[in-house]
From Swiss-Prot:
GO terms for molecular function: protein-lysine N-methyltransferase activity. Belongs to the methyltransferase superfamily. PrmA family. Signal peptide: none annotated. Its main location: cytoplasm. S-adenosyl-L-methionine binds at T147, G168, D190, N238. It is found in: Cytoplasm. This is Ribosomal protein L11 methyltransferase. Keywords: Cytoplasm, Methyltransferase, S-adenosyl-L-methionine, Transferase. One of its GO terms (cellular component) is cytoplasm. InterPro entries: Ribosomal_L11_MeTrfase_PrmA, Ribosomal_PrmA_MeTrfase, SAM-dependent_MTases_sf.
């Protein structure tokens, strides 16, 4: 008896909230999975759909079950709600091109537009500041609430002529936005080589020079030594509260007396604690903003 060798894909779909997107992308990257897309709508920022195409001959039932359970467990670490999942057998679908149709132009605030690199600029957004990104990397493209909070804050407080430092740059979207909103120069840094590569690629996509936006691999301590005595006017850091606490002792060395901090990646419930912690280090809260359960805080040095 001759067994069928028909090739097909297992298409996995999962509806999820945006605050776990970057964790899912990290998991997919660690698993070596590149055939995925995220369907989102600017009109509904609360739900988006992760779609993953898995070759049938490599992913048996047991492997698929482990894959699904890993994603559900990762979600549970952040929130309690149960996610909807679906498996579908797809015959000869060319995911390498079809996944692109699920990405759309994404307006942020009143001025910014995140535009997937292969799309034409829609006429309706022709007056916006366009940031081109390639969603094929292991980093988000601006849909996470904390990233949007940072972009909206840059829009509210454009860094005209300022020197900016972006700690933990990811895709580079915040540094690119800073330049397009008038910053003189941006120094970006990340401890993840994939982030450095993604940022470098997105710098090219946006026709920026290394003089405008430079990115390097390394720690905040490395950056502090590189910048000294050049101080940043604005320091942006979009990461988790425990990480901010680890990085905070270096903030003074990277800044000057009239610099500002823009910190996000915080839960609303953590704002009081992190603000008190930074106050001990000499920083004073100026403003705070929130979206869903996430928050952004702006601080200045506490002058006696």
């Amino acid at each position: 008896m001759i067994q069928s060798t028909e090739f097909f894909w297992w298409k996995f779909e999962l509806v999820f909230p945006p605050d776990v997107e970057e964790s899912f992308l990290w998991f997919l990257n660690m698993a070596g999975i590149k055939s995925y897309a995220i369907e989102r709508s600017p009109d509904n920022l609360q739900d988006q759909t992760l779609m993953v195409w898995l070759p049938s001959h490599e992913w048996l039932k047991k492997d698929r079950e482990e894959f699904e359970n890993s994603l559900l467990a990762l979600n549970k670490a952040f929130r309690e709600d149960v996610l909807n999942t679906k498996w579908e057998k797809i015959i000869d679908e060319d995911w390498s091109s079809s996944w692109k149709k699920f990405w759309k132009a994404d307006p942020v605030g009143s001025k910014i537009l995140i535009l997937p690199s292969w799309l034409e600029l829609p006429d309706i957004y022709s007056n916006r500041i366009v940031i081109k990104l390639d969603p094929g990397s292991a980093f988000g493209t601006g849909s996470h609430p904390t990233t949007r909070l940072c972009l909206e804050d840059l829009e509210r407080n454009p860094p005209l002529g300022k020197k900016v430092v972006d700690i933990g740059c990811g895709s580079g979207v915040l540094g690119i936005a800073a330049i397009k909103l008038g910053a003189k120069e941006v120094r970006a840094i990340d401890i993840d080589s994939l982030a450095v590569r993604a940022t470098s690629e997105n710098i090219v996509l946006n026709n920026l020079s290394q003089k405008q936006l430079s990115v390097s691999l390394g720690s905040i301590e490395n950056l502090a030594n590189q910048l000294n005595p050049l101080s940043a006017d604005l320091l942006i850091c979009n990461t988790l509260s425990p990480v901010i606490k680890e990085l905070a002792p270096y903030f003074f060395k990277l800044t000057h007396s009239y610099s500002r901090l823009c910190l996000s990646g915080l839960l609303v419930a953590q704002v009081e604690d992190i603000t008190n912690f930074l106050s001990i280090l000499g920083w004073e809260l100026i403003d705070s903003y929130s979206s869903d359960n996430w928050a952004l805080i702006r601080l200045c040095r506490n002058h006696p």
